[in-house]
């Protein structure tokens, strides 16, 4: 499982020319699920996302607060392309990406774990399997790659 986590001041997802989700202060997550992933990886990385101290405190000291302490929101988007291998040739190879129906189940469990900690209204997502346009304003910029294998 791989996650690209970006600290944002705003983020949104558009499907078919309509904004389907948006947040203000928080994280934009791009989430890729591999053929080797199970609930163990989902649990591990959901805890990591929730516990990372990326936000500043009231005195503007960096790396002091996690997403909940900062009263932030999460916008999560499933993205199988994070599993791409590009070692050979010029066409990305996605054979390490989980099959859609299994990835969807695991992704929904990931969202459920985030929502159980932050609250239903604080965790939004895109549309699984859809072509989406994502926009964000990255703060910092802070961009962190989480990998369940590392």
UniProtKB/Swiss-Prot annotation:
Name of the featured protein: D-aminoacyl-tRNA deacylase
Listed GO biological process terms: D-leucine catabolic process; D-tyrosine catabolic process; tRNA metabolic process
What EC number(s) are associated with this protein in UniProt? 3.1.1.96
Q: Does the keyword RNA-binding apply?
A: yes
Question: What does the sequence similarity comment in the record state about its family?
Answer: Belongs to the DTD family.
What is known about its subunit structure?
A: Homodimer.
Supply the domain comment. A Gly-cisPro motif from one monomer fits into the active site of the other monomer to allow specific chiral rejection of L-amino acids.
One example of the protein's molecular function in GO is:
D-leucyl-tRNA(Leu) deacylase activity
């Amino acid at each position: 499982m791989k996650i690209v986590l970006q600290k944002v001041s705003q983020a949104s997802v558009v499907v078919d020319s309509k904004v389907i989700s948006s947040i203000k202060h928080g994280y934009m997550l791009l989430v890729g699920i591999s053929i080797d992933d199970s609930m163990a990886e989902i649990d591990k990385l959901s805890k990591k996302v929730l516990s990372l101290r990326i936000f500043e405190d009231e005195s503007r000291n960096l790396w002091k607060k996690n997403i909940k302490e900062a009263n932030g929101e999460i916008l999560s988007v499933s993205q199988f392309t994070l599993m791409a291998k590009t070692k050979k040739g010029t066409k990305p190879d996605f054979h390490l990406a989980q099959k859609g129906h299994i990835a969807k189940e695991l992704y929904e469990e990931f969202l459920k774990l985030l929502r159980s900690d932050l609250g239903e209204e604080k965790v939004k997502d895109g549309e699984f399997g859809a072509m989406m346009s994502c926009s964000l304003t990255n703060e910092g910029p802070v961009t962190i790659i989480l990998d369940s294998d590392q």
